[in-house]
């Protein structure tokens, strides 16, 4: 098992049912979403296939960033209307809500930096990944939240805005005041539960540059994420245009692990003695991988190894799961698992498939997930492995990607020029003395028109456009 891939835990208190339901309803209202309140609102990427190069990456503009191998979580920031206190909630993929105390998130100051201590974000929902990474100075592991999207900011839903606009709002209206608070008032931030950064977004044709950084990042990264620039946010479920690319060795599947210790017969005991058959815990057991077929797991107990699933337990389990494969655990790995002194049976495990031997290998436990991958997802992952796209395949179309990006960019500029020319002509007819049309008062001015690309660690003072 790869210890570097151990998923971090959310440093918060899981909220009870009624409070969770109340917050879920408030969030649905915030997003103007018709999705059920019990559905995780985060969008889910799909595995990359060879056809996606022509049909998607070459057909429209995409951002690319590294795929962090951490714990996916949304961050919801709201002010209690009664107490006027700001609350921060982390939402995992099972749609559980955890209150995280200790933060303060201010609004963007309009006059002076003192406003950082006087204002509070209210109604902001961010998408990101919790990850354990190595501090480059202290060399110690620290918890960090890497943000890569924004669904709402200060009560305004952004899900219908394009990705470029959402990132701009995230950078200017959330990350900049947060960063300024840490810069100007570090004593007020010393007890923050974890640090927060924005992920670097690059143009899709810079994918080779991003790929070269994967091994040198302070955290584990297992591929690339491609996000369409002009797309709205897909609330809940799979987004067929949000693509995750992994090297062949990084394509993984989540299963439920079922342990079967060998049964030994003590022939010295009477056949009627219930102790005649017993489990031999001195021998390495069999490790079965079960694939989820849908539905609620009616046997979701996490049991100790000393309490294997009974026949009736397995009958219940097989209403929603079926045996898929066995996993190879060598003696060294088995000793490591025993040394953990943790429950093993019934847990969700992330596994990779060795392409030469075809054997499944254990990577880590996924206690953040209630169920393994659905059988349809497993099938798609296996197809993705068979239809694998290498980094070389992607790099071969980089020039074409850049060329088509520039063509679309020039087309937009030409369309804007034509629009401005027509607007100027109409204005000249109505105002003979006017040589240049004034901007309409009801024409929206978007934040991203003048916004910055905030880096992972500090705002880009050079105001580089995303």
Curated annotation (Swiss-Prot):
Region annotation Disordered: where it falls in the sequence: 408-466
Which top EC class applies here? Answer: transferase
Per the record, the major location class is nucleus
Any one of the GO CC terms: mRNA capping enzyme complex
Top-rank taxon: Eukaryota
- What are the entry keywords? GTP-binding, mRNA capping, mRNA processing, Nucleotide-binding, Nucleotidyltransferase, Nucleus, Transferase
Amino acid composition bias (Acidic residues), ranges on this chain: 448-459
Q: Where is the composition biased (Polar residues)?
A: 413-443
The places in or outside the cell where this protein is found are: Nucleus
InterPro entries named among the record's database cross-references: mRNA_cap_enzyme_adenylation (IPR001339), mRNA_cap_enzyme_alpha (IPR017075), mRNA_cap_enzyme_C (IPR013846), mRNA_Capping_Enz/RNA_Phosphat (IPR051029), NA-bd_OB-fold (IPR012340)
Molecular function (GO) terms listed?
A: ATP binding; GTP binding; mRNA guanylyltransferase activity
Q: Active-site residues?
A: 67
EC number, as in UniProt? 2.7.7.50
From the UniProt record, list the reaction(s) this protein catalyses: a 5'-end diphospho-ribonucleoside in mRNA + GTP + H(+) = a 5'-end (5'-triphosphoguanosine)-ribonucleoside in mRNA + diphosphate
Family, similarity comment: Belongs to the eukaryotic GTase family.
Quaternary organization: Heterodimer. The mRNA-capping enzyme is composed of two separate chains alpha and beta, respectively a mRNA guanylyltransferase and an mRNA 5'-triphosphate monophosphatase.
Q: What does this protein do?
A: Second step of mRNA capping. Transfer of the GMP moiety of GTP to the 5'-end of RNA via an enzyme-GMP covalent reaction intermediate.
Quote the protein name from its UniProt record.
mRNA-capping enzyme subunit alpha
Organism source for this protein?
Answer: Kluyveromyces lactis (strain ATCC 8585 / CBS 2359 / DSM 70799 / NBRC 1267 / NRRL Y-1140 / WM37)
Q: What is the lineage of its organism?
A: Eukaryota, Fungi, Dikarya, Ascomycota, Saccharomycotina
């Amino acid at each position: 098992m790869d210890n570097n891939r151990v998923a971090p835990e959310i440093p918060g208190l899981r909220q009870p049912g009624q409070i969770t339901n109340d917050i879920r309803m408030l969030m649905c209202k915030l997003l103007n979403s018709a999705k059920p309140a019990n559905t995780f609102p985060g969008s889910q990427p799909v595995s990359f296939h060879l056809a996606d190069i022509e049909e998607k990456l070459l057909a429209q503009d995409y951002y690319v960033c590294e795929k962090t191998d951490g714990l996916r979580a949304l961050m919801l920031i709201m002010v209690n209307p009664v107490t006027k206190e700001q609350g921060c909630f982390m939402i995992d993929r099972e749609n559980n809500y955890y209150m995280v105390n200790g933060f303060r998130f201010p609004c963007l100051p309009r006059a002076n930096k003192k406003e950082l201590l006087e204002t509070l974000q209210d109604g902001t929902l961010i998408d990101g990944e919790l990850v354990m990474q190595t501090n480059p100075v202290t060399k110690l592991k620290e918890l960090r939240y890497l943000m890569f999207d924004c669904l709402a900011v200060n009560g305004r839903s952004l899900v219908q805005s394009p990705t470029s606009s959402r990132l701009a709002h995230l950078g200017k209206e959330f990350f900049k005041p947060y960063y300024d608070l840490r810069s100007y008032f570090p004593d007020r931030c010393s007890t923050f539960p974890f640090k927060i950064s924005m992920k670097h977004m690059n143009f899709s044709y810079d994918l080779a540059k991003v790929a070269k950084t994967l091994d040198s990042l302070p955290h584990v990264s297992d591929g690339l994420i491609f996000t369409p620039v002009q797309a709205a946010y897909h609330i809940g479920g799979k987004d067929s245009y949000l693509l995750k690319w992994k090297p062949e060795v990084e394509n993984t599947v989540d299963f439920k692990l079922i342990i079967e210790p060998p049964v030994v017969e003590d022939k010295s005991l009477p056949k009627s003695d219930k102790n005649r058959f017993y489990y031999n815990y001195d021998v390495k057991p069999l490790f079965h991988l079960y694939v989820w077929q849908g539905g609620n797991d009616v046997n979701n107990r996490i049991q100790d190894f000393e309490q294997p699933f009974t026949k009736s337990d397995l009958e219940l389990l097989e209403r929603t799961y079926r045996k898929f494969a066995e996993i190879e655990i060598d003696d060294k790995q088995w000793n490591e698992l025993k040394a953990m002194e943790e429950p093993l049976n019934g847990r969700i495990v992330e596994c990779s498939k060795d392409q030469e031997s075809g054997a499944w290998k254990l990577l880590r436990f996924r206690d953040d997930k209630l169920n393994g991958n659905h059988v349809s997802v497993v099938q798609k992952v296996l197809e993705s492995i068979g239809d694998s796209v290498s980094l070389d395949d992607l790099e071969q179309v980089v020039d074409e990607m850049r060329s088509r990006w520039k063509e679309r960019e020039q087309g937009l500029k030409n369309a804007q020029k034509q629009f401005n020319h027509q607007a100027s002509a109409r204005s000249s007819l109505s105002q003979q003395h006017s040589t240049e049309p004034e901007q309409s008062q009801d024409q929206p001015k978007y934040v991203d028109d003048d916004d910055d690309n905030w880096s992972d660690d500090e705002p880009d003072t050079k105001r580089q456009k995303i």
